[in-house]
From Swiss-Prot:
Domain NIDO: 107-260
Encoding gene, per UniProt annotation: Ndg
Tissue-specific expression: Expressed in the basement membrane around the follicular epithelium of the adult ovary (at protein level).
Provenance organism: Drosophila melanogaster (Fruit fly)
Protein name in the entry: Nidogen
Segments annotated as LDL-receptor class B repeats: 1084-1126, 1127-1170, 1171-1216, 1257-1282
Record bears the keyword Methyltransferase: no
Pfam families, A to Z: EGF_3, EGF_CA, G2F, Ldl_recept_b, NIDO
Length: 1350
């Protein structure tokens, strides 16, 4: 990296070759062009100093107007952040490239912060008419511009930023720079001065939040949008503004900025004698070292120079990136695919994990048709992986060759005849260090379905250097489409063009070939997100047989072995070693001290001696044996030992110089490793005479042997005579399934993650110890899944009830379920616990859940000012002495009171009476008078927001200016078009800064029952039960065959089943006074309301399995209607005058939806297809039929007293949506179409119709006078009525029909109560943004119940 001294030397050398005539050399010296203008004490006018801070501004009212471009200005603002603006205040730093929205002059526009600077730091502005300054400025202009030989300056305005730091309050590096406006009545010139050594930082620090700051920008912006920037502006080369020049003096720049014609821009000096560069140094490091990246070195060559990235960085020298740092790629798409234009709204976003060569790319928004076909545009998949491929053997990847600036041209030819051209232009890093690309697509690809799964197997592509700066590749590929049982064959031709720079010591790469491996390819279109998601891993420099363990890319520590694993590798510690983190946080393999940990198997009469990677056992004095079994000497003397086997150590009682009891074991292992076949252990390898003759001789067996009937036999995986057993497998291996297999990395305890309450949790696969201090490994972790997913710290792919946390022992971010939930972090299920940390609702509303360390759990504790056990808290005395009451107050019998002439304000403080009402207004707020209420109040000033009592703060800039939305979010206008806010894109939820992927059945198939499928609907992705099953999708039950084609009729005290042919009528249940009823065709049950017992009950169609449904807070349920799709039961209570609803699956979830302007509600009907509810009201003065949405909103009058008299029961015709009703006053059965309000009469001149239903194109109704079930077809022709026997009273009330057809549709409320909380009931409302509303239930206490109806 070039040092300050080398830079200074380069500058001196550069200045030495500037050839100017003696006349002009003397002239430049006399002009003191590189010296800062200073305000001298006693000078005319005054100097303005900016306050310390990071967004300050002051205004200078100009004595003489100044011209800039084609405009004239009288005010000039100076801003902390290195910029001057005309007539407009511009205090905030905007992280966006030029042009800005203001007419401005930027000397060094950057995130300046002087909040904690010392006295040596200042930002000043002064206007001078001192003759010495005017003469100096005039001479400079006359010298630089040949047309200004008569120029005389009338004023010089100077702004200086001296020793300023950068955001956030950093002062370790300081910048100094100046801008001078030199003007007369018509012309204006701007001089920038950057002193030698004055530029030491380029951008502020954002602490990883949002986009990084753009590097300093220098230039001009006109009011009409024209702009001009200096060389290096907004890039790393901005640091050379103090060394470059357009005038001949390093660090000094001069421009003419007025007058400028409409089609022109600012002008640079034109004096030909000002600078002449030496041809010898035109292409040398002395002249152009600053063209290299700051982390690169410049190398001269015979002709020209090359830039080479330094250690720890990679690139082409002009652009260098830090090793292993993730990078983002952003791009746009244009063109035409399959004769359809590619949406220019579609944006490409890639996230590259460079340390792994893994790329994740998203393109959205895309229509399903376009997204499905774009999956076949393979260059979208392969180009970014080529750039950032993992290098093998030092082979350069794409970024090392190009620095991110190149052209990629592709042609795809499909076997089916289609041709496609793709041109990609990579423009290098943008202002925010994101790689920018423009993509053009023209041609056709084969048609594939959006839901078809495309499989592209791993493949190796070959690139050939045609010449330096040009690569070519031709590859034949096959894409498998399993659902369609077809294979798409295609040929991909690629050509890459870039500017190459070969050092003299580098060979010409022409005709050489490089192999790149593409693996783990994903080609998915997600319709919910309107997004194409593609991903891949890539390595460059591979061979067809290479893997990470043999190509040199693996990096394993000592005492570990490299094991190829899928497309990467893992490092497993040798047996006897365990993985631990050293003081640097690096995982190393350290010896396990089995003797200290107690994991050895030595005899209790033996001494354990730890060794590197193992341990030895030695019998203590007075005992003999192999250390794993030791007997006293007296016992051992009576035992006959078999002859010693060669290589077997004699039993000892003291450690020998070579303490290993198996001296040949290492040699045996070496021989065994050389064998191609693993030897199979022989359980009886030795002659019969070696079998022990005494049962106690089993103690002589090896620790790796068992004793069978007095015979020592080595364990599986060991070889020997039973007395000495050697391990067949080497270090890091284990005998399994008849061969040696690599030993997986041992799992060790990890630290738990604990919250502020002390509640701790463990990652998936670990269990919290009883003392909550450690997480112990209990089951295998699905590492493969983690490897295939985008890291959770990148894509926020954890479950909604999980967080993404770093676990140092695992060296990765892991999704961890939150307290109260259990799972792998991608799926978290609630667990039951009596702790308030799990169930905070058990605490009193005036209590907090606090973790008590001595109890080891959380408990409820009353808040300050309350007493009790935490479950029940009562108000405590407010005070016991004046000390408890604060300033200007005293304690009066347990109550704090204000002193005389003081009164309480809204923040409960005692303040002097008067002022603004009874309070003092905070900063940036004023006192206003509300004439309507007759009171004073504090309000924030315009441009400020917040609490006017405690102080108002300036309104922050919105995201369309700051560009600070998070990943998976966009900046969208609010209802006020002037304001913007960050909003998560479809499929994600959050505050727009952190967006978490919503859990759905596509990314979590376990949400669906095994008898359900994940379907895309207008409501999003939902689980839908398969044909023949019913349920909410997460639980599906097989539909039982139900009897059909019969009526169920209420006779008051009896419920009767009436076949449509009128025969075999039979009672199915007894009631006291059942009026309205309806059926649930899904479960084969009939529900009715009993106005005498004040209940709603149900039975099966045959009368069995009687169950209560609603038994409390119900008076007179005269009408019953069931929505079988959303699983809701509605009823009309004529005593309470309400319309209510409850969940069929959980009747405790019930709500009142209408309770206003009802007199005598009777009949009720639901249309689940069109999502409408209808009811009749027997109000004698104003009878009516009304309708509403299913949640009670949108209430409308359908029919009034002019159309109905005594409307009883209602029925909705499924096909047409008509509402039909029986009117005992008009003695008609009529129907009305709710949309156009057209009425048609089905039958008239009736007696007293009450209940009504419809099936098989026929209407059925009960008649109180004829005491029959009357029938008429849809054309109005009367049919033979049914005369059922009467089992109860002689009146028939409500009725319903059981048909074979039972609807099976989706509803937003089907699954998990539609996502509503336990205190709310989900009800369908398509007019709501989510397609549903969450109604407060009748039993909820912490839910604000809005007045239903109107």
């Amino acid at each position: 990296m070039p040092t300050f001294g080398s830079k200074l030397l380069a500058c001196l050398l550069l200045s030495s070759v500037i050839l100017v005539s003696g006349q002009f050399e003397h002239y430049l010296d006399s002009l003191r062009a590189s010296e800062l203008y200073e305000f001298e004490d006693g000078s005319l006018g005054s100097i303005h100093l900016l306050p310390k801070g990071d967004s300050e501004t002051i205004v200078l009212q100009l004595e003489q107007p100044i011209h800039f471009y084609g405009e004239q200005y009288e005010q000039l603002y100076i801003n902390t952040n290195g910029i001057l603006t005309f007539n407009s205040e511009f205090p905030e730093y905007l992280n966006q490239p030029f042009p800005l929205e203001y007419a401005s002059i930027a000397a060094f526009y950057s995130n300046v912060d002087t909040s904690f600077s010392d006295e040596g730091t200042s930002i000043s502005l002064f206007e001078s008419k001192e003759q010495s300054i005017l003469d100096r400025a005039s001479s400079l202009v006359r010298y630089a511009f040949s047309s200004q030989s008569e120029f005389e300056a009338r004023q010089v305005i100077v702004a200086t930023w001296r020793n300023v730091g950068y955001f956030d309050s950093k002062t370790d590096r300081l910048n100094t720079f100046q801008v001078a406006l030199i003007a007369n009545e018509q012309s204006t010139f701007v001089q920038f001065i950057y002193p030698d050594g004055g530029l030491n930082w380029l951008q502020g620090e954002t602490a990883g939040l949002g986009l990084p700051d753009i590097r300093a920008q220098a230039g001009f912006v006109a009011e009409d949008g024209r702009f001009y920037t200096l060389n290096g502006s907004g890039s790393e080369n901005a640091r050379f503004l103090s060394e470059s020049t357009n005038l001949g003096v390093p660090g000094v720049w001069l421009f003419e900025v007025a007058p400028i014609e409409n089609e022109q821009n600012v002008r640079s000096p034109d004096n030909a004698e000002s600078l002449t560069e030496s041809p010898a140094l035109a292409l040398s490091c002395q002249a152009h070292a600053h063209q290299c990246h700051e982390k690169a070195e410049c190398h001269d060559k015979a002709e020209g120079y090359c830039c080479v990235c330094g250690s720890g960085f990679y690139g082409n020298g002009k652009s260098c990136l830090a090793n292993d740092q993730p990078i983002r790629v952003t791009g746009t798409l244009t063109g035409e695919l399959n004769k359809q234009p590619v949406s220019e709204e579609a944006k490409l976003q890639s996230y590259v994990v460079t340390s792994e060569g893994r790329t994740y790319t998203t393109i959205n928004p895309l229509t399903p048709e376009l997204g499905a076909q774009l999956r076949l545009v393979l260059p979208l998949l392969t180009t970014v992986p080529w750039l950032f491929a993992k290098s093998v053997g030092g082979v350069a990847n794409g970024y090392q060759l190009t620095g991110g600036v190149y052209t990629h041209v592709s042609r795809l030819q499909f076997d089916s005849g289609e041709n496609l051209h793709v041109n990609q232009t990579f423009e290098g890093l943008n202002y925010w260090d994101q790689l920018s690309v423009k993509i053009e697509i023209y041609g056709e690809v084969p048609a594939v379905a959006a839901d078809a799964v495309l499989i592209l197997p791993d493949y190796v592509e070959e690139y050939t250097f045609e010449r330096p700066g040009e690569l070519k590749s031709v590859q034949v590929l096959n894409i498998n489409i399993t659902e369609e049982q077809r294979v798409l064959g295609l040929q991909v031709e690629q050509r890459i063009l870039y500017r190459s720079c070969l050092r003299d010591d580098e060979a010409d790469p022409s005709a050489t070939k490089v192999l790149q491996k593409i693996s783990k390819v994903a080609l998915d279109y997600v319709e919910r997100d309107q997004a194409l998601r593609i991903g891949a891993m890539s390595k460059v420099g591979v061979t067809p047989e290479s893997n990470a363990c043999n190509d040199g890319t693996a990096d394993c520590v000592e005492n570990s072995v490299c094991v190829p694993y899928e497309d990467t590798y893992r490092c497993d510690c040798y047996h006897g070693f365990a993985a631990q983190l050293d003081e640097r946080g690096v995982e190393v393999c350290l010896d396990i001290d089995e003797c200290a940990t107690g994991s050895h198997v030595c005899d209790e009469n033996a001494v354990c001696d730890n060794t590197e990677g193992g341990f030895n056992c030695y019998c203590t004095e007075g005992f003999e044996g192999n250390g794993y079994r030791c007997l006293s000497n007296s016992t051992a003397d009576n035992i006959e030992y078999p002859p010693a086997v060669e290589g077997q150590a004699e039993p000892t009682s003291e450690p020998s110089p070579n303490p290993s009891p198996y001296p040949d074991q290492g040699q045996d292992q070496e021989r065994e490793r050389e064998d191609d076949q693993y030897p199979q252990p022989n359980p009886y390898p030795y002659p019969e005479e070696q079998i022990p003759q005494h049962p106690d001789e089993c103690y002589r067996c090896s620790k790796d042997a068992d004793c069978y009937q007095g015979r020592c036999t080595c364990h599986e995986g060991f070889d020997g005579d039973g007395y000495t057993c050697t391990n067949i497998c080497g270090h890091g291996e284990v005998w399994e399934n008849g061969r040696c297999e690599p030993l997986l990395l041992e799992r060790h305890d990890v630290d738990p993650l604990c919250d502020a309450l002390g509640e701790c949790r463990c990652p998936y696969g670990y269990e919290l110890s009883e003392d909550s201090q450690r997480c112990t490994y209990v089951q295998e972790f699905d590492g493969e899944r983690n490897a295939d997913l985008i890291p959770c710290d990148v894509d926020e792919n954890c479950h909604i009830n999980a967080t993404c946390n770093w676990y140092g022992q695992e060296l990765r971010h892991i999704c961890t379920c939150q307290p109260g939930f259990r799972g792998d972090g991608y799926n978290c299920d609630p667990i039951s616990d009596d702790s308030c940390a799990i169930r905070p609702d058990i605490c009193d509303v005036h209590a907090d859940c606090v973790y008590e360390e001595h109890l080891g759990k959380s408990e409820c504790q009353c808040q300050a000012g309350y007493t009790g056990n935490g479950f029940n808290c009562q108000l405590a005395a407010e005070c016991q002495s004046a000390e408890h009451c604060g300033e200007n107050a005293f304690c009066d019998d347990g109550v704090c009171r204000c002193q005389a002439d003081f009164e309480r304000d809204v923040s409960d403080r005692c303040v002097p009476a008067g002022r603004c009402g009874s309070v003092f207004c905070g900063s940036n707020a004023i006192c206003k008078w509300d004439s309507a209420e007759g009171v004073q109040y504090c309000d924030c000033l315009d441009g400020y927001q917040g609490d006017a009592l405690t102080g108002c703060t300036s309104k922050p800039l919105s995201c369309h200016v700051l560009n600070n939305c998070g990943i998976h979010a966009t900046c969208e206008p609010t209802e006020d078009p002037a304001n913007y806010e960050c909003q998560c894109i479809a499929g994600f939820k959050g505050d727009g800064y952190v967006c978490i992927e919503e859990q759905n059945c596509l990314n979590n198939p376990t949400l669906c029952d095994m008898n359900a499928q994940c379907r895309s609907t207008n409501s999003g992705l939902v689980c839908v039960c398969n044909q023949g099953f019913f349920g909410n999708g997460s639980l599906c039950q097989e539909r039982q065959h139900q009897d059909s084609d019969f009526l169920i009729v209420s006779q008051g005290v009896m419920i009767a089943r009436v076949p449509l042919n009128g025969r075999n009528v039979r009672p199915i249940s007894v009631a006291q006074m059942a009026i309205g009823l309806d059926k649930d065709c899904v479960e084969g049950r009939v529900y009715w309301g009993d106005i005498s017992t004040k209940k709603i009950v149900s039975t099966k169609y045959d009368g069995t399995d009687l169950r209560p449904f609603i038994t409390t807070d119900i008076e007179s349920p005269e009408g019953i209607a069931i929505d079988v799709i959303s699983r809701r039961l509605y009823w009309a209570d004529s005593a309470k005058d309400t319309i209510e609803v409850a969940s069929l699956d959980d009747p405790s979830l019930r709500a009142v939806i209408i309770n206003k302007q009802l007199v005598n509600p009777r009949g009720i009907a639901v249309d689940p297809y069109r999502e409408k509810l209808f009811w009749s009201d027997w109000d004698r003065e104003s009878p009516k039929i009304e309708m509403s949405n299913l949640d009670g909103t949108g209430r409308e009058l359908l029919l009034g007293k002019d159309d109905v008299t005594l409307p009883n029961s209602l029925v909705v015709l499924e096909n047409s949506g008509e509402v039909c009703y029986a009117d005992a006053g008009t003695k008609k059965v009529e129907c009305i179409e709710p949309q156009n309000r057209q009425i048609r009469t089905i039958s008239n001149e009736l007696s007293y119709p009450f209940g009504i239903t419809f099936t098989h194109d026929q209407f059925y109704w009960t008649d109180w006078t004829t005491k029959k079930v009357e029938i008429v077809d849809s054309l109005g022709a009367r049919q033979t009525p049914i005369q059922p026997p009467f089992f109860g009273s002689h009146k028939m009330y409500g009725m319903t029909v059981v048909e074979q057809h039972c609807p099976q549709y989706q509803s937003p409320c089907q699954i998990s109560n539609g996502g509503c909380t336990d205190s709310r009931l989900c009800l369908v409302n398509r007019q709501a943004p989510s397609g549903k509303s969450c109604k407060c239930t009748s039993a909820s206490t912490g839910c604000t119940v809005l007045a239903p109806g109107y």
